[in-house]
Amino acid sequence: MKITNQKAKFDYELGERIEAGIVLNGAEAKSAYGGAIDMTHSYAKIMPSKFKGQREAWVINLHIYPYSHADNDKYDPKRTRKLLLHQKELLSLETKMRTARLQLVPTAMYTSSGKIKLELALSRGKRMFEKRESIKKKDLDREMERGSK
């Protein structure tokens, strides 16, 4: 199972990538194994923990659709979910985000030895003219590919 965030490649310039675990409940995990996930408007934030001097990473707006065979009365599909990272990783990410004005964006979700992992990328948002340029470049590359055949 591998789910990618195609919109992130279009909206952001993706840089360094990080693998993180994610805290899910049972029905969410089954739904994630089934591929019922939407990552289009999701992002990650690093916030202070309730423990003094520590940080926590959270993913926001990650939409995991309800599992069909579970009790979904009080289920919130867009709730914030905790990411599992070491404190050294969190501190280095936070300094990079502050100094270079970057954001953490989820780019993929996959399984690794039975555990669900989320791939995050340090990214900078593209402006509208940069998006247009990338579309033009893709079109030109496609035309060149067709012409060479």
What are the functions of these language-model segments?
Residues M1-K149:
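Ribosome-associated RNA-binding proteins
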